[in-house]
Amino acid sequence: MGRRVSGKVGLLVGATLALASGCATQPKLPARSEVLRGVLPSAVQLLSERAGGGGHRAASGVVVASDPVRRLTWILTAGHFVAAPAPETIYVRTTGTRDRYRATLVRADRDPDLALVLVENLVLPPVKSREVAHLGDDVWVIAFPRGRQMTLASGTVSQVGLGKDADPTEGPVQQIDTSVSYGASGAGVFDAETGELIGVVEGYRTAQIATRDAPDRVMEIPVPGETIVISAQAVRRFLSRSDLGAFLPR
């Protein structure tokens, strides 16, 4: 799922120093393959079906909270995915399976463009998040483009917002240079070193292309490397209004 606006944003969630022998060393980070295996179960696909079989739409999502006792899982996705004019049924499909679980809409906002859905009788691991990103950080986007199989795309943080220390190189992530397409809205943006969630895909910029033979017919294509992200900071504020504090990962 992804909104596109030509030429504009297409709308679519500390290292500790150790001193040894007079030298400062950083703790060893886990291998990226291990990090990836840890975050994959938290990435899901969302599907919506219109009543009466009038078509379907797709988006991506990320698990932000769970309750193992009551077997409940809360999933974050893009707000515009659930903003359909006609009633729709929402389903969640987990990574690596064809199983579908019916979901209930809990909350949706336009600013930020986020939605929270609840799935019963399913327990998935929630992600941990980090609100500060750094320019050049390696990131992963785990999405289900065009409603198909899971895709892992890599890139870097290319734009951050103003942080509390006014450091131009760090702050809430705003843009990454990872290329995404329709169906990636709501996908988690993860730090590739730690697996922490630093944001959620909102959309991508598009360009209009017309052919000489049919100038009235315009195609909109994603602009490579201009993916807009809702920061983990904005995700935290959104979740704080959803009464999930007891179920969020510490």
What are these regions (language model features)?
Residues 34-35, 62-66, 104-106, 118-149:
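Active-site substrate-binding loop(s) of clan PA
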Residues 66-111, 121, 212-214:
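Catalytic-histidine neighborhood of serine endopeptidases
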Residues 1-11:
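Bacterial N-terminal signal peptides that target proteins for export
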Residues 40-47, 59, 118-126, 151-238:
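Active-site region of chymotrypsin-like
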Residues 10-20:
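Bacterial N-terminal signal peptides
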Residues 29-32, 43, 47-75, 101-102, ...:
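A conserved glycine-rich beta-strand in the N-terminal activation segment of trypsin-fold
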Residues 46-48, 87-96, 137-144:
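Short conserved beta-strand and strand-loop elements enriched in small hydrophobics
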